[in-house]
């Protein structure tokens, strides 16, 4: 087993605090402080010469949007931005693999894009009918994601 890098550990700690906020009634978490911690680990793409920095940056941007949503209460707007970031990450991977820009038609026909959109719609359908915080549903969703163990671009997720 490999040791988790400090930035990875910080990222996962912040994400775990979000899950805690969603599932533990009256959890007291300083998300402004967590946002500051996240900002410290955002990679500078100019410091790297490999594709992996792009999805890492996207993941930090998405988590940052999530933290802003919690802080400001702008969940719908931020959820749309996070959805677009995630889809953009998949598009970037496909274009990097093809070593060219792909048209919208080409992207829409790719299995990876279909899978990403299917997953996003599945999550949306599960959550849209919730009138209040459904802790069991949230925990079930979290467990399903953890069990999958693979990111939207095929990277193994360390637990």
Language model features: what each stretch is:
Residues 1-105, 109, 113:
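Structured binding/interaction patches within domain cores
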Residues 88-159:
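C-terminal auxiliary extensions adjacent to catalytic cores
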């Amino acid at each position: 087993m490999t040791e988790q890098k400090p930035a990875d550990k910080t990222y996962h700690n912040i994400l775990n605090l979000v899950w805690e906020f969603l599932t533990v009634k009256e959890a007291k978490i300083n998300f402004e402080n967590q946002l500051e911690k996240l900002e410290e680990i955002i990679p500078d793409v100019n410091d790297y010469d490999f594709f992996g920095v792009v999805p890492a940056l996207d993941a930090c941007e998405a988590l940052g949007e999530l933290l802003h949503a919690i802080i400001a209460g702008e969940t719908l707007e931020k959820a749309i931005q996070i959805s677009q970031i995630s889809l953009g990450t998949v598009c970037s991977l496909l274009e990097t693999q093809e070593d060219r820009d792909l048209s919208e038609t080409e992207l829409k026909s790719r299995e990876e894009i279909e899978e990403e959109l299917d997953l996003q719609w599945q999550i949306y359908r599960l959550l849209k009918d919730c009138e209040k915080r459904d802790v069991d549903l949230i925990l079930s969703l979290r467990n399903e994601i953890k069990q999958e163990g693979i990111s939207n671009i095929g990277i193994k997720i360390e637990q």
